Amino acid sequence: MTKRHLLSAGDLTRDDATAILDDADRFREALLGREVKKLPTLRGRTIITMFYENSTRTRVSFEVAGKWMSADVINVSASGSSVAKGESLRDTALTLRAAGADALIIRHPASGAAQQLAEWTVEEDGGGPSVINAGDGTHEHPTQALLDALTIRQRLGSVEGKRVVIVGDVLHSRVARSNVTLLHTLGAEVVLVSPPTLLPRGVENWPVTVSYDLDAELPAADAVLMLRVQAERMNGSFFPSAREYSVRYGLSEKRQAMLPDRAIVLHPGPMVRGMEISFPVADSPQSAVLQQVSNGVHVRMAVLFHLLVGADREAINV
Protein backbone atom coordinates (compact mmCIF):
# COMPACT_ATOMS: atom_id res chain seq x y z
CA MET A 1 0.00 0.00 0.00
CA THR A 2 1.63 3.25 -1.16
CA LYS A 3 -1.14 5.71 -0.34
CA ARG A 4 -0.68 8.39 2.33
CA HIS A 5 -4.29 8.43 3.55
CA LEU A 6 -7.11 6.02 4.29
CA LEU A 7 -10.30 7.93 3.58
CA SER A 8 -12.56 5.27 2.08
CA ALA A 9 -12.79 1.51 1.72
CA GLY A 10 -12.66 2.24 -2.00
CA ASP A 11 -9.06 3.41 -1.56
CA LEU A 12 -8.04 -0.21 -0.99
CA THR A 13 -7.27 -2.73 -3.69
CA ARG A 14 -7.64 -6.40 -2.90
CA ASP A 15 -3.87 -6.61 -2.37
CA ASP A 16 -3.91 -3.53 -0.10
CA ALA A 17 -6.66 -4.93 2.08
CA THR A 18 -5.10 -8.39 2.26
CA ALA A 19 -1.73 -6.92 3.26
CA ILE A 20 -3.36 -4.92 6.07
CA LEU A 21 -5.25 -7.97 7.33
CA ASP A 22 -2.09 -10.08 7.17
CA ASP A 23 -0.14 -7.48 9.12
CA ALA A 24 -2.92 -7.14 11.68
CA ASP A 25 -2.48 -10.84 12.38
CA ARG A 26 1.29 -10.34 12.56
CA PHE A 27 0.89 -7.58 15.14
CA ARG A 28 -1.42 -9.79 17.18
CA GLU A 29 1.14 -12.57 17.13
CA ALA A 30 4.03 -10.20 17.92
CA LEU A 31 2.24 -9.02 21.07
CA LEU A 32 1.24 -12.48 22.31
CA GLY A 33 2.92 -13.36 25.58
CA ARG A 34 4.49 -9.92 26.03
CA GLU A 35 4.16 -8.67 29.59
CA VAL A 36 4.68 -5.12 28.32
CA LYS A 37 2.68 -4.58 25.14
CA LYS A 38 5.08 -2.20 23.42
CA LEU A 39 6.69 -2.32 19.99
CA PRO A 40 9.08 0.45 18.84
CA THR A 41 7.50 0.63 15.38
CA LEU A 42 6.28 4.26 15.61
CA ARG A 43 8.69 5.64 18.20
CA GLY A 44 9.11 9.37 17.66
CA ARG A 45 5.87 9.70 15.65
CA THR A 46 2.99 11.92 16.75
CA ILE A 47 -0.60 10.79 16.20
CA ILE A 48 -3.48 13.17 16.88
CA THR A 49 -7.05 11.94 17.17
CA MET A 50 -9.81 14.42 16.33
CA PHE A 51 -13.16 13.11 17.52
CA TYR A 52 -16.10 15.44 16.92
CA GLU A 53 -18.62 12.67 17.61
CA ASN A 54 -18.89 10.34 20.59
CA SER A 55 -16.95 7.09 20.34
CA THR A 56 -15.80 4.28 22.59
CA ARG A 57 -14.47 1.40 20.47
CA THR A 58 -12.92 3.36 17.62
CA ARG A 59 -11.31 6.05 19.71
CA VAL A 60 -9.92 3.70 22.34
CA SER A 61 -8.61 1.22 19.78
CA PHE A 62 -6.79 3.92 17.81
CA GLU A 63 -5.25 5.23 21.03
CA VAL A 64 -4.21 1.75 22.15
CA ALA A 65 -2.86 0.97 18.67
CA GLY A 66 -0.68 4.07 18.66
CA LYS A 67 0.58 3.54 22.20
CA TRP A 68 1.36 -0.15 21.64
CA MET A 69 3.53 1.02 18.72
CA SER A 70 5.28 3.60 20.96
CA ALA A 71 3.83 6.66 19.22
CA ASP A 72 2.89 9.82 21.09
CA VAL A 73 -0.91 9.95 20.95
CA ILE A 74 -2.71 13.25 21.57
CA ASN A 75 -6.47 13.65 21.74
CA VAL A 76 -8.37 16.68 20.44
CA SER A 77 -12.12 17.00 20.99
CA ALA A 78 -14.55 19.71 19.97
CA SER A 79 -15.45 20.57 23.55
CA GLY A 80 -11.86 20.68 24.78
CA SER A 81 -10.30 22.67 21.96
CA SER A 82 -10.65 26.05 20.26
CA VAL A 83 -13.47 24.56 18.18
CA ALA A 84 -15.64 25.41 21.19
CA LYS A 85 -14.59 29.05 20.64
CA GLY A 86 -15.60 29.00 17.00
CA GLU A 87 -12.41 27.84 15.30
CA SER A 88 -13.03 26.16 11.94
CA LEU A 89 -12.01 22.60 11.17
CA ARG A 90 -9.61 23.95 8.54
CA ASP A 91 -7.80 26.21 11.01
CA THR A 92 -7.63 23.40 13.55
CA ALA A 93 -6.17 21.09 10.91
CA LEU A 94 -3.53 23.61 9.82
CA THR A 95 -2.61 24.21 13.46
CA LEU A 96 -2.10 20.50 14.08
CA ARG A 97 -0.04 20.15 10.90
CA ALA A 98 2.16 23.06 12.02
CA ALA A 99 2.54 21.39 15.42
CA GLY A 100 4.18 18.41 13.74
CA ALA A 101 1.48 15.75 13.53
CA ASP A 102 2.47 12.67 11.54
CA ALA A 103 -1.09 11.33 11.41
CA LEU A 104 -4.53 12.85 11.95
CA ILE A 105 -7.37 10.49 12.79
CA ILE A 106 -10.75 12.16 12.39
CA ARG A 107 -14.33 11.33 13.24
CA HIS A 108 -16.80 14.02 12.21
CA PRO A 109 -20.57 14.32 11.69
CA ALA A 110 -20.12 15.79 8.19
CA SER A 111 -19.71 13.40 5.27
CA GLY A 112 -16.52 14.26 3.40
CA ALA A 113 -14.75 15.80 6.40
CA ALA A 114 -11.80 13.40 6.17
CA GLN A 115 -11.29 14.19 2.47
CA GLN A 116 -11.35 17.90 3.26
CA LEU A 117 -8.81 17.42 6.04
CA ALA A 118 -6.45 15.60 3.67
CA GLU A 119 -6.73 18.41 1.12
CA TRP A 120 -6.22 21.18 3.68
CA THR A 121 -3.14 19.66 5.29
CA VAL A 122 -1.13 18.72 2.19
CA GLU A 123 2.09 20.73 1.97
CA GLU A 124 3.56 22.40 -1.11
CA ASP A 125 6.01 19.55 -1.60
CA GLY A 126 3.20 17.00 -1.38
CA GLY A 127 4.00 16.03 2.20
CA GLY A 128 1.93 16.53 5.32
CA PRO A 129 0.28 14.27 7.86
CA SER A 130 -1.49 11.07 6.91
CA VAL A 131 -5.26 11.29 7.41
CA ILE A 132 -7.33 8.33 8.55
CA ASN A 133 -11.11 8.44 8.36
CA ALA A 134 -12.54 7.13 11.64
CA GLY A 135 -16.10 7.80 10.46
CA ASP A 136 -17.51 10.80 8.59
CA GLY A 137 -21.24 11.28 8.83
CA THR A 138 -23.14 8.58 6.97
CA HIS A 139 -20.35 8.27 4.42
CA GLU A 140 -17.51 5.86 5.33
CA HIS A 141 -15.77 3.99 8.15
CA PRO A 142 -12.99 2.03 6.40
CA THR A 143 -11.15 0.66 9.44
CA GLN A 144 -14.41 -0.83 10.76
CA ALA A 145 -14.82 -2.70 7.47
CA LEU A 146 -11.25 -3.96 7.75
CA LEU A 147 -11.72 -5.30 11.26
CA ASP A 148 -15.01 -6.94 10.25
CA ALA A 149 -13.26 -8.61 7.32
CA LEU A 150 -10.46 -9.78 9.60
CA THR A 151 -12.97 -11.27 12.03
CA ILE A 152 -14.74 -13.12 9.21
CA ARG A 153 -11.42 -14.42 7.93
CA GLN A 154 -10.30 -15.61 11.36
CA ARG A 155 -13.58 -17.36 12.15
CA LEU A 156 -14.44 -18.73 8.70
CA GLY A 157 -11.04 -19.16 7.06
CA SER A 158 -11.53 -16.62 4.28
CA VAL A 159 -13.74 -13.77 3.09
CA GLU A 160 -13.92 -14.82 -0.54
CA GLY A 161 -17.10 -16.67 -1.41
CA LYS A 162 -18.74 -16.01 1.94
CA ARG A 163 -22.33 -14.77 2.09
CA VAL A 164 -22.56 -11.78 4.44
CA VAL A 165 -26.02 -10.50 5.39
CA ILE A 166 -26.07 -6.88 6.60
CA VAL A 167 -29.25 -6.08 8.52
CA GLY A 168 -30.85 -2.84 9.63
CA ASP A 169 -30.42 0.88 9.15
CA VAL A 170 -28.37 0.92 5.96
CA LEU A 171 -29.51 4.44 5.09
CA HIS A 172 -27.61 6.11 7.93
CA SER A 173 -24.78 3.58 8.22
CA ARG A 174 -21.23 4.43 7.21
CA VAL A 175 -20.33 0.94 8.42
CA ALA A 176 -22.64 -0.63 5.84
CA ARG A 177 -21.23 1.47 3.01
CA SER A 178 -17.61 0.65 3.81
CA ASN A 179 -18.39 -3.03 4.37
CA VAL A 180 -20.23 -3.37 1.07
CA THR A 181 -17.25 -1.90 -0.77
CA LEU A 182 -14.55 -3.90 1.02
CA LEU A 183 -16.40 -7.20 1.14
CA HIS A 184 -17.07 -6.95 -2.59
CA THR A 185 -13.39 -6.18 -3.18
CA LEU A 186 -12.45 -9.29 -1.19
CA GLY A 187 -14.87 -11.51 -3.11
CA ALA A 188 -17.76 -11.91 -0.67
CA GLU A 189 -21.44 -11.96 -1.59
CA VAL A 190 -23.34 -9.24 0.25
CA VAL A 191 -27.06 -9.18 1.03
CA LEU A 192 -28.76 -6.13 2.53
CA VAL A 193 -31.88 -6.72 4.63
CA SER A 194 -33.72 -3.59 5.68
CA PRO A 195 -37.06 -1.84 5.71
CA PRO A 196 -37.51 0.01 2.40
CA THR A 197 -37.47 3.30 4.31
CA LEU A 198 -33.96 2.59 5.63
CA LEU A 199 -32.33 1.87 2.27
CA PRO A 200 -30.47 4.69 0.47
CA ARG A 201 -31.33 5.93 -2.98
CA GLY A 202 -29.28 4.25 -5.65
CA VAL A 203 -28.80 1.04 -3.67
CA GLU A 204 -29.82 -0.88 -6.78
CA ASN A 205 -26.44 0.15 -8.22
CA TRP A 206 -24.47 -1.30 -5.32
CA PRO A 207 -22.83 -4.75 -5.68
CA VAL A 208 -25.42 -6.33 -3.38
CA THR A 209 -28.68 -8.25 -3.28
CA VAL A 210 -31.50 -6.44 -1.47
CA SER A 211 -34.08 -8.32 0.59
CA TYR A 212 -36.85 -7.31 2.97
CA ASP A 213 -37.24 -10.76 4.53
CA LEU A 214 -34.65 -11.57 7.19
CA ASP A 215 -35.98 -15.07 7.82
CA ALA A 216 -35.45 -15.99 4.17
CA GLU A 217 -31.78 -14.93 4.23
CA LEU A 218 -30.53 -16.46 7.48
CA PRO A 219 -30.31 -20.16 6.49
CA ALA A 220 -27.70 -19.43 3.79
CA ALA A 221 -25.72 -16.81 5.73
CA ASP A 222 -22.08 -17.27 6.69
CA ALA A 223 -22.03 -14.03 8.67
CA VAL A 224 -24.74 -11.65 9.83
CA LEU A 225 -23.80 -8.04 10.52
CA MET A 226 -26.44 -6.32 12.63
CA LEU A 227 -26.65 -2.53 12.44
CA ARG A 228 -27.88 -0.17 15.12
CA VAL A 229 -30.84 2.06 14.27
CA GLN A 230 -29.25 5.52 14.29
CA ALA A 231 -32.08 7.51 15.79
CA GLU A 232 -29.78 10.51 16.30
CA ARG A 233 -29.55 10.94 12.51
CA MET A 234 -33.29 10.61 11.87
CA ASN A 235 -35.58 13.59 11.40
CA GLY A 236 -38.78 11.60 10.95
CA SER A 237 -40.40 8.24 11.48
CA PHE A 238 -38.79 5.48 9.39
CA PHE A 239 -40.74 2.57 10.95
CA PRO A 240 -43.91 2.24 13.06
CA SER A 241 -42.25 1.49 16.42
CA ALA A 242 -39.15 0.01 18.01
CA ARG A 243 -41.12 -3.12 18.86
CA GLU A 244 -42.32 -3.55 15.28
CA TYR A 245 -38.78 -3.06 14.01
CA SER A 246 -37.44 -5.67 16.43
CA VAL A 247 -40.13 -8.17 15.44
CA ARG A 248 -39.30 -7.88 11.75
CA TYR A 249 -35.57 -7.13 11.73
CA GLY A 250 -34.17 -8.04 15.15
CA LEU A 251 -31.92 -11.07 15.62
CA SER A 252 -33.72 -13.11 18.27
CA GLU A 253 -32.86 -16.57 19.61
CA LYS A 254 -35.53 -18.00 17.31
CA ARG A 255 -33.89 -16.40 14.29
CA GLN A 256 -30.43 -17.39 15.46
CA ALA A 257 -31.56 -21.01 15.29
CA MET A 258 -32.12 -20.52 11.54
CA LEU A 259 -28.42 -19.81 11.01
CA PRO A 260 -25.97 -22.54 10.03
CA ASP A 261 -23.96 -23.73 13.02
CA ARG A 262 -20.77 -22.27 11.56
CA ALA A 263 -22.23 -18.81 10.93
CA ILE A 264 -21.10 -15.84 12.99
CA VAL A 265 -22.87 -12.75 14.28
CA LEU A 266 -21.19 -9.35 14.02
CA HIS A 267 -22.12 -5.91 15.35
CA PRO A 268 -20.06 -2.70 15.03
CA GLY A 269 -21.40 -1.36 18.33
CA PRO A 270 -22.81 0.19 20.28
CA MET A 271 -25.46 -2.52 20.53
CA VAL A 272 -29.03 -1.73 21.50
CA ARG A 273 -29.84 -5.05 23.11
CA GLY A 274 -33.46 -6.01 22.82
CA MET A 275 -33.95 -4.06 19.60
CA GLU A 276 -31.68 -5.18 16.75
CA ILE A 277 -30.14 -8.03 18.75
CA SER A 278 -31.32 -9.98 21.78
CA PHE A 279 -29.30 -10.34 24.98
CA PRO A 280 -28.72 -14.11 24.56
CA VAL A 281 -27.64 -13.79 20.91
CA ALA A 282 -25.18 -11.01 21.70
CA ASP A 283 -23.55 -13.20 24.35
CA SER A 284 -23.71 -16.50 22.46
CA PRO A 285 -20.73 -18.48 21.08
CA GLN A 286 -21.73 -17.42 17.56
CA SER A 287 -21.28 -13.77 18.51
CA ALA A 288 -17.92 -12.34 17.42
CA VAL A 289 -18.53 -8.88 18.88
CA LEU A 290 -15.66 -8.88 21.38
CA GLN A 291 -13.34 -10.45 18.81
CA GLN A 292 -14.19 -7.49 16.57
CA VAL A 293 -13.07 -5.12 19.33
CA SER A 294 -9.75 -6.95 19.77
CA ASN A 295 -9.23 -7.03 16.02
CA GLY A 296 -9.91 -3.30 15.88
CA VAL A 297 -6.68 -2.59 17.74
CA HIS A 298 -4.56 -4.84 15.52
CA VAL A 299 -6.16 -3.60 12.29
CA ARG A 300 -5.53 0.01 13.28
CA MET A 301 -1.95 -0.85 14.17
CA ALA A 302 -1.59 -2.30 10.67
CA VAL A 303 -3.16 0.77 9.03
CA LEU A 304 -0.84 3.12 10.92
CA PHE A 305 2.09 0.89 10.00
CA HIS A 306 1.26 0.94 6.29
CA LEU A 307 0.71 4.70 6.16
CA LEU A 308 3.65 5.79 8.32
CA VAL A 309 6.28 3.08 7.88
CA GLY A 310 5.57 1.18 4.68
CA ALA A 311 6.49 -2.35 3.72
CA ASP A 312 9.31 -3.14 6.19
CA ARG A 313 7.87 -6.31 7.75
CA GLU A 314 10.89 -6.64 10.08
CA ALA A 315 9.64 -3.53 11.91
CA ILE A 316 6.65 -5.51 13.17
CA ASN A 317 8.64 -8.14 15.04
CA VAL A 318 11.24 -5.93 16.74
Swiss-Prot record:
Coiled coil: none
Binding annotation for carbamoyl phosphate: R57, T58, R107, H141, Q144, G269, P270
Binding positions for L-aspartate per the UniProt entry: K85, R174, R228
GO cellular component annotations of the record: cytosol
Signal sequence annotation: none
Role description: Catalyzes the condensation of carbamoyl phosphate and aspartate to form carbamoyl aspartate and inorganic phosphate, the committed step in the de novo pyrimidine nucleotide biosynthesis pathway.
Protein name: Aspartate carbamoyltransferase catalytic subunit
Gene for this chain: pyrB
